[in-house]
Amino acid sequence: MSQGPPTGESSEPEAKVLHTKRLYRAVVEAVHRLDLILCNKTAYQEVFKPENISLRNKLRELCVKLMFLHPVDYGRKAEELLWRKVYYEVIQLIKTNKKHIHSRSTLECAYRTHLVAGIGFYQHLLLYIQSHYQLELQCCIDWTHVTDPLIGCKKPVSASGKEMDWAQMACHRCLVYLGDLSRYQNELAGVDTELLAERFYYQALSVAPQIGMPFNQLGTLAGSKYYNVEAMYCYLRCIQSEVSFEGAYGNLKRLYDKAAKMYHQLKKCETRKLSPGKKRCKDIKRLLVNFMYLQSLLQPKSSSVDSELTSLCQSVLEDFNLCLFYLPSSPNLSLASEDEEEYESGYAFLPDLLIFQMVIICLMCVHSLERAGSKQYSAAIAFTLALFSHLVNHVNIRLQAELEEGENPVPAFQSDGTDEPESKEPVEKEEEPDPEPPPVTPQVGEGRKSRKFSRLSCLRRRRHPPKVGDDSDLSEGFESDSSHDSARASEGSDSGSDKSLEGGGTAFDAETDSEMNSQESRSDLEDMEEEEGTRSPTLEPPRGRSEAPDSLNGPLGPSEASIASNLQAMSTQMFQTKRCFRLAPTFSNLLLQPTTNPHTSASHRPCVNGDVDKPSEPASEEGSESEGSESSGRSCRNERSIQEKLQVLMAEGLLPAVKVFLDWLRTNPDLIIVCAQSSQSLWNRLSVLLNLLPAAGELQESGLALCPEVQDLLEGCELPDLPSSLLLPEDMALRNLPPLRAAHRRFNFDTDRPLLSTLEESVVRICCIRSFGHFIARLQGSILQFNPEVGIFVSIAQSEQESLLQQAQAQFRMAQEEARRNRLMRDMAQLRLQLEVSQLEGSLQQPKAQSAMSPYLVPDTQALCHHLPVIRQLATSGRFIVIIPRTVIDGLDLLKKEHPGARDGIRYLEAEFKKGNRYIRCQKEVGKSFERHKLKRQDADAWTLYKILDSCKQLTLAQGAGEEDPSGMVTIITGLPLDNPSVLSGPMQAALQAAAHASVDIKNVLDFYKQWKEIG
């Protein structure tokens, strides 16, 4: 601050130079006075005194005048002083002394006001800069300066080019400051501005995409969510930006150190029997922690043992494949258990955005290793291609589940043992060489997730969705005492480091993050992988990466052949070892019943599968590849319309990740050629996906209302190279990413792009993916071939068929085989669930419990309204399956307006159903029940009991179909007093007698709970 102002140019008026000097001296004096205040030990008590607030306001006015009077020489310096002295240093002072500041105290209120005032000031400054320099930022930010409609044109601007550049970057920095202030607000109790802060940072990136600072701030904002994977993505994006931020390197290193600590702690943890939801969360945690640790090993300067790296790659791939089977019952809802405080909270499925970020992390890792010439480049390529293969497989599974929905409807809740006897043997013996668990059950659960609980959802009052928690026993915030001088001054912002505080308590009750700015996975059935020999999907290596190679089919040089040899050895270890995979079905809340329709595979169009050598005899089940997704959706009996297909494709959130990865592969054709034979599984799955997507001709003939740009794109959709390109959201999000720089050369990010609807974006995505299919079909090695007569893509093995007729016949046989496999897997899922139920029943066969406890509990409306905590304990004990009939839900609906207990019950049931808790299930009505309309008017309680009894008879009849006596299997737990039945009404007494005749017990919920506790 001791230095004087820069000498003004001779052409400047002398009065302006003198005015600038006076302003600068006034700024220096105000800064000096503020520094003296901050040096006191009790500065946090004085900083919000009126005289100090006035001093900061004076400094703010002086800085604004200075930056607009002489923006080129003083603008950046004035911005920095304004931010640091008026806002940031006050914020850091309060955060440092948070232990002295109590919740709802005068100081905390003043601090909140300070943040709000800062947001208001920078929003005003942002608008003023745009207005003063007539900047056109409509495509970048929300709060834009709108041209005066009375003038009808822009005002002339007499600013130089340097001044315009400063104004543009000043807007960028204002948005970063707004994001920081919103992030600080988010740390306060009772304030949720995380999404607002995130939006400001992304708008800053839109204004200046070459600056990496906002990504560092986004990493700090992410905190420990998803065990730091999201933060790792942001820090890597910052580091790989054109103008990176030095603080991101330290932040990333701390994440890697933390990942190593968590990884070794997880390895030491003894395995204990967990509930299905907790086991599911444990699998997700293991995947994300191992993925983080793997990325720390796949660094240019990392020294890791090859055996450890290979083993870790295998573990991550297995867990990735397993966890992709975990699907949410409702979008954007975390399935972490809320009522078991003794366990850590967790995540029960992988969001599409997180999977997208994991794929991009792999691409950034490959890019950095290649640029550094690291020996681990081969391992990174092998791992990335294998991970993408799993991703494509699961996209196929999910698309087929939606496209084939309706062929095998799910029956009502049943628990009978009517499985076909021949389906039991494969459960015991089946060994499949491919690592994917059977994908069939998700087809049923996922296909109905949008309407499974629609009735219960409509009973609730509108509420804000719950905030996904990011707590973890190993995810505490970072501690760092880094200096905030030189590094911050260069960027004009604090470098992050503020940690996301947990809500509750005081406003300052958590540490800061960085001072550098199936409903279950547990399974008693395991698929053991066999040695595959030559059929193993090993990946061979690429040569050194060439972003824009002149020759697509050129030979490998000596050094490239050495890399190929290394990668082949690595991939052989990674994909040929014998591994164990757990069955991971995603059950709906209705028990699955095996399908008896033998014609589900009938098709009038060929169905593409990756392996045509697979015979259709049952004996081949042992040796066939478990490519659960590799049967095309075109094998459906009822062919879906184009509109229906597009609705399914629009809803599939993994397609953007597939599209981006294929863009990267398109710029690395040598990698595709080298890996063509060894990664056959990937190309098989890709051929399935290509055939699931509608062709350009189908889209053009469908009469869809598409904008001219998309219609032009459709004209070249079936060509290897798209003649035109349209920007998609995923392309904008990855702007300036080095691994995709070659792929993005065909885009013009600076021109106005047409606003595409979700449907049009989906069509553009389809065009890009199908064009890639034609692109690799022309490459050397015949990786894929396109058969124009049938309109399908076929892989190498399929193209070896002698004739088109034989090829089509092989496709039909594979469709039939796939349908048989699907039925078998449904049978396996049914048997597995029955095994769990039998184990649950067996756990009750204690001397006292045998005659007293029932495995199935059916609460009535009164029990849920008045004794919800008791119901929660019974449901979470793991000893009972709680059945909720439709009648009970209707009763809660009637009472919700006047009874708060009914509203609590509705919220609880909705949350449990969305979690997929297997111990509490909703039961649909089957068949026609006897309607007692007169009784409904006379005695509503008796009528309700009869309706519940009708539902219970389904369970007792199902049990009676077997050899065991169904008596004592089902108990209705009611909130009504049953101590003296004689005082009950006549219809109620008759209902109790009917229950006894139906082998259904009826007990008061408190009496049942007391009896259960006594038995222990």
From Swiss-Prot:
Protein localization: Cytoplasm; Nucleus
Annotated protein name in UniProt: Nonsense-mediated mRNA decay factor SMG5
Coiled coil: 798-841
Gene Ontology BP term (one): regulation of telomere maintenance
Gene name of this polypeptide: SMG5
Biased composition (Polar residues): 594-603
Species the sequence originates in: Homo sapiens
Keywords noted in UniProt: Acetylation, Coiled coil, Cytoplasm, Nonsense-mediated mRNA decay, Nucleus, Phosphoprotein
One GO molecular-function entry: protein phosphatase 2A binding
Gene3D superfamilies noted in UniProt: 5'-nuclease, Tetratricopeptide repeat domain
